[in-house]
């Protein structure tokens, strides 16, 4: 075991049963990158019986997935472990490509990574483990942490009814990826090991170099797999959605120009509008029904409330009354204080929540995730479906 990690400890130790690690098999999701590679190597050093699993997601040769498959296979050969490949192209096409396309067509700005984590990656890994029966746990290279609930880690949160396992931010806030994991189930968390949860990115590189991993110097991917495959999100959109001309209107009602499809715009966008105005204008909202792009001054982008749907309560039971949270409405944004209020439908059931911010927020974007935290604990998250006009 690496001395540098002895003090930090591998994550999820509290959820591991007393059975010797050498008797337990773990499947590690391998993308071909340095993070997942190091996760596998660290688990091997820690005494686990490790096998790799790579999901084949994208159709076509020369894609990011085919390169990742080659790198992952080579890594497994270097480490002396089995490499499993799972053909997930059909489910990825249905759950990510199709739903991303539908989102853009509806005037939303989808979050493909969350779709993939929710309906493809972790579900496929979990199903693989359950089907194979020989594996006990799954692991990935995400910068986040999982802890089993104890009196110690929830003693300051009396207002919440916690589930058995907590999802927490990664120790490196600059690399924390918990935002993308808000859709995970307790079943997944109960089996999930995150070896990098307590590490900083620079430590990851150093350890990968020290261990001589072939991926140690591999550049970090900054793009979605859809972007890497198609070249840009614009090319993905052009490949899947037909252009449809519509109007660009100022929120005061004045027609300023035309566009070739609302799928090309997102809330807060300034560049590429192709209109003239005395001062900078930004996309304020998108009207799918009328095919109109509304623009406004920057001050008009600030809103106080948003409606959140399809909420997954990761670490707590669904609250029955309003709660105070720290909400993160995009991956790189800082969490902001707000109140979540249950919204009941005509059947008196709570299907949505209203998120009321302490301070007005700019460019609240339907289709993106709103993720709720209490300090380091990720409580839950859902999709922004609308925002207030105030």
From Swiss-Prot:
Chain positions of site Interaction with tRNA: 142, 368
Listed GO biological process terms: tRNA wobble position uridine thiolation
Record has tRNA-binding as a keyword: yes
Molecular-function GO terms, alphabetical: ATP binding; tRNA binding; tRNA-uridine 2-sulfurtransferase activity
GO-annotated cellular components: cytoplasm
Protein origin, superkingdom: Bacteria
Pfam family, one: tRNA_Me_trans
Keyword tRNA processing: yes
UniProt-annotated catalytic positions: 116, 225
Region (Interaction with tRNA): 175-177, 330-331
Residue runs in coiled coils: none
Disulfide bonds: 116-225
Enzyme Commission no: 2.8.1.13
Residues that coordinate or bind ATP: 29-36, 55, 141
InterPro entries: MnmA-like, MnmA-like_C, MnmA-like_central, MnmA-like_central_sf, Rossmann-like_a/b/a_fold
Entry keywords, A to Z: ATP-binding, Cytoplasm, Disulfide bond, Nucleotide-binding, RNA-binding, Transferase, tRNA processing, tRNA-binding
Catalyzed reactions per annotation: S-sulfanyl-L-cysteinyl-[protein] + uridine(34) in tRNA + AH2 + ATP = 2-thiouridine(34) in tRNA + L-cysteinyl-[protein] + A + AMP + diphosphate + H(+)
Top EC class for this record: transferase
Membership in a protein family: Belongs to the MnmA/TRMU family.
UniProt function note: Catalyzes the 2-thiolation of uridine at the wobble position (U34) of tRNA, leading to the formation of s(2)U34.
Protein name: tRNA-specific 2-thiouridylase MnmA
Organism from which the protein derives: Prochlorococcus marinus subsp. pastoris (strain CCMP1986 / NIES-2087 / MED4)
UniProt gene name: mnmA
């Amino acid at each position: 075991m690496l001395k540098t990690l002895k003090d930090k400890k591998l994550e999820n130790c509290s959820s591991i049963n007393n059975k010797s690690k050498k008797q337990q098999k773990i499947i590690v999701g391998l993308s071909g990158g340095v993070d997942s590679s190091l996760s596998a190597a660290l688990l091997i050093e820690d005494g686990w019986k490790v096998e790799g699993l790579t999901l084949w997601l994208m159709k076509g040769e020369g894609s990011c997935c085919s390169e990742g498959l080659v790198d992952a296979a080579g890594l497994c050969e270097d480490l002396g472990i089995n490499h499993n490949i799972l053909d997930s192209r059909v489910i990825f096409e249905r759950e990510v490509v199709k739903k991303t396309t539908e989102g853009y067509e509806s005037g939303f700005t989808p979050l493909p990574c969350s779709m993939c984590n929710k309906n493809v990656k972790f579900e496929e890994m979990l199903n693989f483990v359950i089907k194979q029966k020989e594996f006990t746990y799954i692991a990935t290279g995400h910068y986040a942490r999982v802890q089993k609930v104890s009196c110690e880690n929830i003693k300051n949160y009396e207002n919440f009814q916690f589930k058995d396992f907590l999802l927490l931010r990664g120790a490196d806030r600059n690399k924390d990826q918990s935002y993308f994991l808000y859709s995970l189930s307790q079943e997944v968390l109960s089996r999930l090991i995150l070896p990098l949860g307590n590490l900083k990115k620079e430590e990851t590189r150093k350890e990968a170099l020290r261990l001589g991993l072939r991926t140690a110097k591999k550049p970090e991917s900054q793009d979605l797999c859809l972007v890497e495959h198609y070249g840009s999100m614009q090319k993905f959109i052009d490949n899947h959605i037909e252009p449809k001309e519509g109007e660009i209107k100022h929120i005061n009602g004045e027609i300023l120009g035309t566009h070739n499809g609302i799928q090309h715009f997102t809330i807060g966008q300034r560049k590429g509008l192709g209109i003239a105005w005395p001062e900078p204008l930004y996309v304020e909202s998108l009207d799918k029904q009328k095919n109109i792009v509304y623009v406004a001054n920057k001050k008009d982008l600030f809103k106080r409330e948003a409606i959140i749907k399809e909420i997954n309560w990761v670490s707590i039971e669904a609250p029955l009354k309003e709660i105070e949270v720290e909400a993160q409405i995009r991956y790189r944004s800082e969490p902001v204080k707000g109140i979540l209020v249950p919204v009941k439908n005509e059947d008196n059931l709570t299907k949505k929540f209203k998120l009321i911010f302490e301070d007005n927020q700019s460019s609240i974007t339907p289709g993106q995730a709103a993720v709720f935290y209490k300090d380091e604990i990720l409580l839950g998250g859902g999709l922004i479906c609308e925002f207030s006009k105030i």
